[in-house]
Amino acid sequence: SFAMTPEARALANNFASNKGALPWPVERGIITGKFGKHPHPIVKGVIVDNPHIEITTEENAIVRSVFEGEVSSVVPIPGANVMVLVRHGNYFTVYSNLINVKVKAGDMVSLKEPIGTAFTDEEGKTMVQLGIWKDADIQDPNPWLAK
């Protein structure tokens, strides 16, 4: 680990001070998958441990960065289409289940800048996963988002 530059520290402080006020990554949606450990909604006796929340949204929904930052990586994930990682100082936001990704590693993104499109499966369900990390610690994204 290395010391943050003054700019990165300022960005991290800004990110942290916006807890509870971050915009949602999509304009319309509902949280259909909770963060953390909870019983599987269908399979009895199975515990799900989600490192993110799942937001169900409308078809062709544009997924936007919830804060300004730098795209750290764009990675194809088997079964989750493409994942985009955006760095905000020592905070990261992770967006997965994206298609038509508009950004690449090294790009600077602004607040609410489109980064891709939420994927729609064969059953017509459109969903994006949002994760928030502080260094290596996974955060529950729900309290970070504006209500």
What are these regions (language model features)?
Residues I77, L98-I99, T120, W144:
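Residue-level structural signal for beta-strand termini and adjacent loop
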Residues V74, N90-M108, K112:
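Short histidine-centered loop motifs in beta-beta connectors
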Residues V84, A105-K147:
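Conserved, short, structured surface segments that act as functional micro-motifs
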Residues E54, L85, V94-N97, T117:
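Conserved beta-strand positions that form and line the central face of beta-propeller blades
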Residues S1-S73, P78-N81, R87, Q129, ...:
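Extracytoplasmic/periplasmic cell wall- or extracellular glycan-interacting regions that localize
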